[in-house]
Design a protein with these regions (language model features):
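Conserved alpha-helix/loop element of class I SAM-dependent methyltransferases that forms part
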Residues: 33-53, 63-67
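Class I SAM-dependent methyltransferase SAM/SAH-binding core
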Residues: 55-56, 60-107
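A short acidic, Gly/Pro-enriched loop at the edge of an enzyme's catalytic core
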Residues: 106-118
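A short SAM/SAH-binding and catalytic strip from SAM-dependent methyltransferases
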Residues: 116-129
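A short glycine-rich, Lys/Arg-flanked "PGG" loop and its adjoining helix->strand segment in the class I
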Residues: 131-143
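Conserved beta-strand signature within the Rossmann-like core of class I S-adenosyl-L-methionine
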Residues: 144-152
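Short alpha-helix
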Residues: 176-192
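Core SAM-dependent methyltransferase catalytic element
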Residues: 197-220
Length: 220
């Protein structure tokens, strides 16, 4: 099932600020336990049979590493340098062979048709151009390769949508361009994948603006 919400087009992120980038890196590192509590079972199921070489868009502080098989190689596409020390610590902790790339999700620098799996968690909300990021995923995947994702999305009509609209601008400023109301389901469905499976679910917890979420797999 693919939920439909008003499509929000790409728009430039707020003017970057090093202190905000640092604060975001520290915030998400400190929230690793909460992410594990809320998304751990879903990530474990989605990542269970990934190949030994995986690209992750927006790897952040490495919250997904614990769900990869020890000995896996992770190519972490993460342009925020303030997360890189945490990435290295988590790679050592979970036995992951880590390669960090500072390129943006829209232009990873990886060769076309070179990988079998790309993952991302709560990333397409923040990239400057989600259409370009999805095109890049499709470009670097080999035929039959998988794009595995978990994303928060715009809500359908109701109180949560009202909260998203109310907080949209301050949220976007505080969280490095994160858009609360993107129609990511439609963007993935339109990205040219051979097969797309999307499951809407409710995140729950204290962060009401990101309650509506999706997870799934798209096959190149």
């Amino acid at each position: 099932m693919i939920e439909t919400t008003p499509l929000v087009h790409a728009e430039p992120a707020p003017w970057p600020h090093p202190r905000r980038a640092w604060a975001n890196a520290k915030f998400f590192e400190s929230m690793d336990w909460y992410s594990h509590r809320r998304l751990g079972a879903r990530k474990r199921a989605l990542f269970a049979d990934l190949p030994r070489v995986v690209v992750e868009l927006g790897a952040g502080a490495g919250a997904s590493m614990r769900y990869l098989a020890p000995g896996s190689k992770l190519i972490a596409v993460e342009p925020n340098p303030h997360t890189h020390d945490a990435l290295r610590r988590n790679a050592e902790r979970y036995g992951i062979d880590l390669e960090i790339r500072e390129e943006p999700a829209e232009s990873t620098g990886l060769a076309g048709a070179s990988v079998d799996a790309v993952i991302c968690t709560l990333v397409l909300c923040t990239v400057g151009d989600p259409t370009a990021a999805l095109a890049e995923v499709h470009r670097i995947l080999r035929p039959g390769g998988r794009f595995v994702f978990i994303e928060h999305v715009g809500s359908g009509p109701g109180p949560v949508r009202a909260v998203q609209r109310l907080l949209r601008r301050p949220w976007r400023y505080l969280f490095d361009g994160c858009c609360l109301d993107r129609d990511t389901s439609s963007s993935i469905a339109a990205a040219g994948f051979a097969d797309v499976r999307i499951e809407p679910f409710r995140f729950g917890g204290a962060f009401v603006p990101v309650w509506p979420q999706i997870s799934g797999v798209a096959v190149a």
